[in-house]
């Protein structure tokens, strides 16, 4: 038959070739072997495409058919579905067709509502996604910023420095990361907070911190003396620190305090110099500033300098005596010199008396203009540097002249310029006779800067320059960048913060030192929260108690999301140090809570514990989170997390000190305590928790070989059917179980089937019949076991849950072996 078919096909091909050759109009095409191969490949690919589609259909039929699904029926249903009737354009209706009009209006309203709901849903999803991204990015920014070494350009300065990073390696466990000075500061902070939380009178934090200074470190002692002097001001009532700090009264007070500090320091310097050279100083006469300055000049100016004018008083130049008396802050002593030499000084005595008796050391405008005119005409190029300096101070003129012959040290330069600072803008002063505090601050911070003051060799000098010009934030930020001086900078910031003198950044993502829009040009803000968190990061893992004391200063601060910074820092501290019991307290066996360190700072600890528990939960630390929620009496969250922890370990074999044994004991302890105290949680979560405990007991009995006890447990739980009549009931009940129960279904089914199969083998292994067990009883039991196995198979096939193919195969295999 096949031979005849091929012969007929050959005959037709030859006939077709003959007919084609007979047509002369058509050109004759000859193909080479490569072209024939390509054409064959094209035909083959078409055939394979059709064949592969058919093969895929066959495979789909086999796969779905094994689950009881008819693929042809599904295909027909899918083809019959059409969206045309739902979204097709509405048919036009006549004006008089009321029914059609109403139907169209109804359909239009439905479609509009659906479209509006769709747009609103997508919009809400986009908004939620955007907010989530912003919050996450804000957290990432915080972590990045907290690792930067400094603010501004210094943050990206890669020059070699000997200073270590903020984040130093933690020492061995149990060893403090605080050095002796830092520990001494921490003790004073503890004393301060103890007074605050106990409701006592607020102590002076500045005095507490100043008591820490090392006896042999004069720089630190001088620093705290300067801080005490500069903060001893009366603040004007204002809504915030910026308005208070920017008021004219407070700025004038800062300048007065700075001058007082510089004058007292210089007087102390002259005392030390004189008493160190008593023979040369020839100290004598009535004790006081005048005699002190006279003796000091015996050392400083042993021989008269050329160019000094207006004679001498007791062998010393007049203007030098006046200048150094003023430099020591004693205008009465300077007045004494003026009175002795009044005949050589002309009108100066009158001007000096007015200057000395004025409230703000300021001449009247008329007198000031007269003195300035005299200075410009007769004294600008005078050869006596002391005379020029005194006139520039009293008349506040020629501010561009630094008087370097007299003010040869930084402290002298500061004193001279602060004396020339003016606050009232009468509009009559020329630029060379006017120096504002803002101009002077800008000159020191931006024009001169750190490079001018050789900060690596003299860090305290630059700190002093900034602090005495009321640039507290810039001074603190500078000192904080030096590892060995960081603790001092932090505690100066704490003192200013408590005195309401610190200008804080409005957001925690700002640099350590920043300038915000709307602030005066010379004003800088300090990121106080970041400063404190960077400082505590060094020791929070080894000294969490001390870190907590510092975080208490943030109790009224909030982050960009409005979250309390004290709560946030405590939660991060607890997670980082894992000192849950010590900081937050511990739950005793009777359910009472043993107080922790946090109880000293607040009477209501639940919000803090719940916050820490939430952070632990978000980090995946479910076991710690469950304990913390238990500490906060949040039963719903405790059982919810315990369900997540218990679900994976339910079918595991128990072993001493294993993960399952630990979690089981923890769960049993919670269950016993909740039942004894009558604590209940959400009904669904509660029932899941106790069902998981029962399943753990079931598997423990099963793995121990106590199959009869295990069978009794699974029978009482009513989780799987053990007869055909209860299959549908169990399938319906299965829909109400949580995922924690469903995930263990495969193991429960296999264990139950194994129990039935073991009982079946044991039944078959007994003698055929006996007086106590007749043959009929054995047959009934055999039938019952097979029926129970069949019920399990039916249940596994009907539940709306995908079990593994291996589970189904093993279930079927054991059921077949029983038959």
UniProtKB/Swiss-Prot annotation:
Modification Phosphothreonine, positions: 49
GO function terms (MF aspect): structural constituent of nuclear pore
Subcellular location: Nucleus membrane; Nucleus, Nuclear pore complex; Nucleus envelope
Pfam families hit by this protein: Nic96 (PF04097)
InterPro entries in UniProt: Nucleoporin_int_Nup93/Nic96 (IPR007231)
Primary subcellular site in the record, as a coarse category: nucleus
Keywords per UniProt: Membrane, mRNA transport, Nuclear pore complex, Nucleus, Phosphoprotein, Protein transport, Translocation, Transport
Superkingdom of this protein's organism: Eukaryota
One GO CC annotation: nuclear periphery
Residue numbers carrying Phosphoserine: 52, 66, 72, 75, 80, 430, 767
Membrane topology: Peripheral membrane protein
Gene Ontology BP terms: nuclear envelope organization; nuclear pore complex assembly; poly(A)+ mRNA export from nucleus; positive regulation of SMAD protein signal transduction; protein import into nucleus
Coiled coil: none
Subunit relationships: Part of the nuclear pore complex (NPC). Component of the p62 complex, a complex composed of NUP62 and NUP54. Forms a complex with NUP35, NUP155, NUP205 and lamin B; the interaction with NUP35 is direct. Does not interact with TPR. Interacts with SMAD4 and IPO7; translocates SMAD4 to the nucleus through the NPC upon BMP7 stimulation resulting in activation of SMAD4 signaling.
Protein's job: Plays a role in the nuclear pore complex (NPC) assembly and/or maintenance. May anchor nucleoporins, but not NUP153 and TPR, to the NPC. During renal development, regulates podocyte migration and proliferation through SMAD4 signaling.
Annotated family: Belongs to the nucleoporin interacting component (NIC) family.
Protein name in the entry: Nuclear pore complex protein Nup93
Organism: Bos taurus
